[in-house]
């Protein structure tokens, strides 16, 4: 009887060891969606119903651009600066719980982006070339 119990306990221990990393990966993926400090009220899906109440921060040389993402600064005179020292100030937008309004004509898929520079359309975390933004 002891022989039949021993393989079972080793099997369950082995399964636990194998499932633990899988569980940790699943939890990590779920947590990366939004941090507590910058999640909108009502969760990530409530973003569409929340109207931005303030203008996004100024950035770039002499403050001529606007923050359009965590490390993206764009303006008509400067184009888009991504991951540069001028765009570092845009990280501070994550500290605010209130969303900001990016100025510029709507563009992109389902008009979810804004024209932020000549020929450039940006959504929350990425920018692309768009002929509507000329």
From Swiss-Prot:
The keyword Disulfide bond applies. Disulfide bonds join 34-39, 56-100, 59-73, 67-90, 74-80, 107-121, 115-133, 122-127. PROSITE patterns: NEUROHYPOPHYS_HORM. It is found in: Secreted. Residues 44-50 form a propeptide. The keyword Zinc does not apply. GO terms for molecular function: neurohypophyseal hormone activity. The cysteine framework of the terepressin is C-C. Belongs to the vasopressin/oxytocin family. This is Terepressin/terephysin.
């Amino acid at each position: 009887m002891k022989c039949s119990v021993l393989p079972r306990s080793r099997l369950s221990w082995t399964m636990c060891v194998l499932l633990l990393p899988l569980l940790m990966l699943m939890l990590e993926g779920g947590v990366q969606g939004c941090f507590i400090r910058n999640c909108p009220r009502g969760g990530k899906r409530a973003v569409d119903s929340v109207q931005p109440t303030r203008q996004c921060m100024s950035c770039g040389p002499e403050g001529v651009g606007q923050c359009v993402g965590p490390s993206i600064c764009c303006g008509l005179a400067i184009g888009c600066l991504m991951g540069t020292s001028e765009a570092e100030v845009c990280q501070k937008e994550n500290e605010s719980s209130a969303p900001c309004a990016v100025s510029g004509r709507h563009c992109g898929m389902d008009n979810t982006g804004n024209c932020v520079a000549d020929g450039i359309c940006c959504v929350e975390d990425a920018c692309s070339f768009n002929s509507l933004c000329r």
